[in-house]
């Protein structure tokens, strides 16, 4: 399926590949709906959310030692269509925040949907404090 950018001629659809991650099922549907409103692909919406909210998330997390894989209840596999450069950019932001791709995308998606940064960080902090959970 062509993305908004490929339809505008900025990227060929063949330049993009599946990039997998897991999201809470309810959040996944909210992200799909938000992208749909803008007539964007989910990948484009996630990239925009990461660009807008990634720096704020990184600042809010500070030096907090987080679990790299917080447990996700009712997780749903999600495939984003991204170029290699877009995937690397997303992963670089995740690593800078001390998170894996799924946790980072979950956090910036929640921020992009209007949740407060303190609530998102508190949930990550709670995951960091749960003993005996190795992702």
Q: Where are the model-predicted features located?
A:
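Surface-exposed, Lys/Arg-rich phosphate-binding patches that contact polyanionic backbones
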Residues: 10-11, 25-44, 48, 84-103
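General helical structural elements
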Residues: 32-34, 62, 91, 105, ...
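Short, basic amphipathic alpha-helical segments that act as recognition/interaction helices
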Residues: 40-63, 99-123
